Amino acid sequence: MNQDFPHISVLSQELIAGLNIQPGGHYLDLTLGGGGHSRLLLEAHPETTVTAIDRDQSALEAAKISLAPYLDSRLTLWWGNFADYDGQNSSFDGIIADLGVSSPQFDQSERGFSFRHTAALDMRMDRCQSLTAADIINHWHEKELADLFYQYGEERLSRPIARSIVQKRPFTTTTELAAVIASSVPASYRYGRIHPATRVFQALRIAVNQELDSLQQLLDQAPHWLKSRGIIAMISFHSLEDRLIKYGFRENNSLKIITKKPIIPSREEQAKNPRSRSAKLRIAQKIESEVI
């Protein structure tokens, strides 16, 4: 685990086993994060090479330290949104993605991803971009907010929540917003299994970082970057991501689905890492090209 960007990789063994690592293979890690999966790829065989991407510069800076022995010779780092990566001139034996927010991003209160700490409403994975969660909350129309919470957060009380937000804005902090969301829903919902702000914060994060649009672009492009019989493995953390991956794999004629049902963490892994509970791993393989 990278101590400067501490993140416990989820479903690591299942992911590596599913990739069927090839000696001297070239692999693409679309979500470097704490570097756990990239490290496992590099350790799988002494000649394996990895290209790793992250839109969060702090993850890349941390990886330059934790994965220093592999840099230049076997590991290449690329900063940016994976949807903007041009892999047309590459040919990978495997591609992996561990989607969503990493533990450091959640735990660093100043990033504004969590309402457990008071922080500015930010939520940017790439802190060089301009749009923040505060921009959305304070400037979007009520209907736009309600639609956002419903579509990206699957929040059934999106309309009363949006109404309360518009009435009481502007907002500057995460806890201030979370309190208003909680006060706008019935008590039975307010004290339910999850905090009533959870789905709203998910929706805001997805919108700020254009997560679903980026994922759809990736699903359209990534199979073209695979060698014949190359494998793509993707870990999702909520139903919107999983649905896109499921149908993206199914509708691509160049892919054969390996996992008929998604692989989920074992009870042991869930006990050790509660954040893994919602993870789902889907794997597909590029169909072998016919020789003409």
UniProtKB/Swiss-Prot annotation:
- Kindly list the GO molecular function terms attached to this UniProt entry: rRNA (cytosine-N4-)-methyltransferase activity
Enzyme class label:
transferase
| Reactions mediated catalytically | cytidine(1402) in 16S rRNA + S-adenosyl-L-methionine = N(4)-methylcytidine(1402) in 16S rRNA + S-adenosyl-L-homocysteine + H(+)
Just give the chief location class: cytoplasm
Question: In its keyword annotation, does this UniProt entry include Metal-binding?
Answer: no
Annotated residues that bind S-adenosyl-L-methionine are located at: G35, G36, H37, D54, D98, Q105
Q: Return the NCBIfam families for the record.
A: 16S rRNA (cytosine(1402)-N(4))-methyltransferase RsmH
This protein's name: Ribosomal RNA small subunit methyltransferase H
Family classification: Belongs to the methyltransferase superfamily. RsmH family.
Cellular component terms per the entry's GO annotation: cytoplasm
Could you list this entry's UniProt keywords, alphabetically sorted: Cytoplasm, Methyltransferase, rRNA processing, S-adenosyl-L-methionine, Transferase
Functional summary from the UniProt entry: Specifically methylates the N4 position of cytidine in position 1402 (C1402) of 16S rRNA.
Q: Where is this protein localized, as stated in its record?
A: Cytoplasm
GO BP annotations of the record are: rRNA base methylation
Q: What is its EC number?
A: 2.1.1.199
Q: Which InterPro entries match?
A: RsmH, SAM-dep_MeTrfase_MraW_recog, SAM-dependent_MTases_sf
